[in-house]
Amino acid sequence: MILSAFSLEGKVAVVTGCDTGLGQGMALGLAQAGCDIVGINIVEPTETIEQVTALGRRFLSLTADLRKIDGIPALLDRAVAEFGHIDILVNNAGLIRREDALEFSEKDWDDVMNLNIKSVFFMSQAAAKHFIAQGNGGKIINIASMLSFQGGIRVPSYTASKSGVMGVTRLMANEWAKHNINVNAIAPGYMATNNTQQLRADEQRSAEILDRIPAGRWGLPSDLMGPIVFLASSASDYVNGYTIAVDGGWLAR
């Protein structure tokens, strides 16, 4: 039956940045589909751990600043040592800094680029090596953005990094498909998370945004559950190098 293709029973998913918001929603979706979760965060994701384990799934919490890539191989080695294998990687951890392009600092450029694109590549590289060694392939899902497609304003390093995420997703898909590794991305639209709290509090700006979204509402972390389970499951085995917009129709407007 087709529904069995969406089952993730027995799988292990590594999810970065899953303490709140979209990362938490995706981790919970994967756990509901059957995954045990390895969460990599800069803080202990207490709420996520509680919700995942309440589903009867295991959760391994690892603490790291992924802007520093030296420790990435050891993180995935630790995950494999704990569970025996890893099957899915979700590169969700991200950072945004806002300033006019004329005033944007090197530090704000480097901090965002190091986390949003550099860590994505080296996390994927380390995971792919495990997938190849295990011999069963794997799934890598990167988190892109509407600014992978659009320019935006006052977020130069974020736009550059998310454009890079979509590009490197395609490259890795091209190189690793022969190893049965699927690499795809999700581009969330305007989501009701901590990152958009200021925007949502601005009544005029929030109204302008909602007027542009055909669905007429802000997205929720739960809106990513279906797409992440699809891309992590065998139902997407012939989907490779693609970025799925989950934006209520924003990009279609």
Curated annotation (Swiss-Prot):
Stated induction or repression of this protein's expression: Is under the control of KdgR repressor. Its expression is up-regulated in the presence of galacturonate and glucuronate. Is also up-regulated in intestinal E.coli of mice fed a lactose-rich diet and down-regulated in E.coli of mice on a casein-rich diet.
GO biological process: D-galacturonate catabolic process; D-glucuronate catabolic process
KW Oxidoreductase (keyword) present: yes
Gene3D superfamilies for the chain: NAD(P)-binding Rossmann-like Domain
Short name of any one Pfam family annotated for the protein: adh_short
Amino-acid positions noted as binding NAD(+) in the UniProt annotation, renumbered to this chain: 14-38
EC number: 1.1.1.127, 1.1.1.-
List of catalytic residues: 158 (proton acceptor)
Protein keywords: NAD, Oxidoreductase
Domain of life: Bacteria
Residues binding substrate, per UniProt: 145
Transmembrane segments: none
Comment on pH dependence: Optimum pH is 7.0 for the reduction of 11-DOC, and 9.5 for the oxidation of D-gluconate.
Temperature dependence: Optimum temperature is 37 degrees Celsius for the reduction of 11-DOC.
Top enzyme class: oxidoreductase
Catalytic activity: 2-dehydro-3-deoxy-D-gluconate + NAD(+) = 3-deoxy-D-glycero-2,5-hexodiulosonate + NADH + H(+); 4-pregnen-20,21-diol-3-one + NAD(+) = 21-hydroxyprogesterone + NADH + H(+)
GO molecular function annotation: 11-deoxycorticosterone reductase activity; 2-dehydro-3-deoxy-D-gluconate 5-dehydrogenase activity; 2-deoxy-D-gluconate 3-dehydrogenase activity; NAD binding; oxidoreductase activity, acting on the CH-OH group of donors, NAD or NADP as acceptor; steroid dehydrogenase activity, acting on the CH-OH group of donors, NAD or NADP as acceptor
Described purpose of this protein according to its UniProt entry: Catalyzes the reversible reduction of 2,5-diketo-3-deoxygluconate (DKII or 4,6-dihydroxy-2,5-dioxohexanoate) into 2-keto-3-deoxygluconate (KDG or 2-dehydro-3-deoxygluconate) with a concomitant oxidation of NADH. To a lesser extent, can also reduce 5-keto-D-gluconate and oxidize D-gluconate and 1,2-propanediol. Together with KduI, seems to play a role in the catabolism of hexuronates under osmotic stress conditions, substituting for the regular hexuronate degrading enzymes UxaABC and UxuAB whose expression is repressed in these conditions.
Family membership noted in the UniProt record: Belongs to the short-chain dehydrogenases/reductases (SDR) family.
Self-association and partners: Homotetramer.
Protein name (Swiss-Prot/TrEMBL): 2-dehydro-3-deoxy-D-gluconate 5-dehydrogenase
Gene source species: Escherichia coli (strain K12)
Lineage, uppermost ranks: Bacteria, Pseudomonadati, Pseudomonadota, Gammaproteobacteria, Enterobacterales
